[in-house]
Amino acid sequence: MSDNKQYRLVTRSDFDGLVCAILLKHINLVNDILFVHPKDMQDGIIAVGANDISTNLPFVDGVHIAFDHHHSETLRNEKKDNHIIDPEAPSAARVVYDYYGGTETFPASWESMMKAVDKGDSAQFDMEEVLHPKRWELLNFIMDSRTGLGRFRDFRISNYELMMDLIEFGKDHSINELLELPDVKERTELYFAHEEKFKAQIKRCATVHGNLVVLDLRDEEIIYSGNRFVIYALFPQCNISIHIMWGLKKQNTVFATGKSIFDRSSTTNVGELMLKYNGGGHNAAGTCQVPHEQNEACLAELISAINADS
């Protein structure tokens, strides 16, 4: 921090990425931001170098410094001095916050924001917050690309522009003020408009395999938007789920696997399981992408492995 050099932040376009950006801009470390998909980092599609700081993404050699909290990254990489990783941290933002001095460096008024990002990234929600989100929980869900709002409307501004606005606005405004921003309200209104259709779709497309619920959305013409934890509220008897979706331009099949946030008894290490199929994640959630011709065999293997762990 002493050389006054500024870097580009490479991160995810989600709530954790937003808070990482707010923290790093506060200490004048970043002057540019690039939002990327984690698999693009892992596959080397994103060109990064000594002028980049990455957060919440697979480690790529050559970056100035990388912050993360994904368990699978400790398995995939040898320990490096510029890879600041804490699998016990609830969010990548918390790793950044602690590394740069915590309360000695950052405003005390940000404590509610830090608690919210920790809660959001580690999914410490209760059933009421999942089924009827408000305040920080609602902001977290509308910023999560997996909620799927972007499929339905050309919003006044893009998600990138909204992220950039929230980075500036979020540092000195309350959550109630953030939710009153017209571009945020536009998204929350759509979220609530889809709420009941989303629940009905989950019930129609889900199949239960022991402790696992599999949601196959590939044949659905419209996939309604909604937060990714609703499935656990609708299937409380299951402690883990797999969402099956088309990959980009239907080039492959995506298996997005996550543990229930209400029944946390599953012993499967999802990140390690996904790593076997060139994916990744952490103990409680992860994804992999497989060629179409392998998807049936892969799904059968995943179901078998997850049921064996129960």
PLM regions and their residue ranges:
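Active-site rim beta-loop-alpha module in soluble metabolic enzymes
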Residues: 168-217
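Long, charge-rich alpha-helical interaction segments
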Residues: 145-185
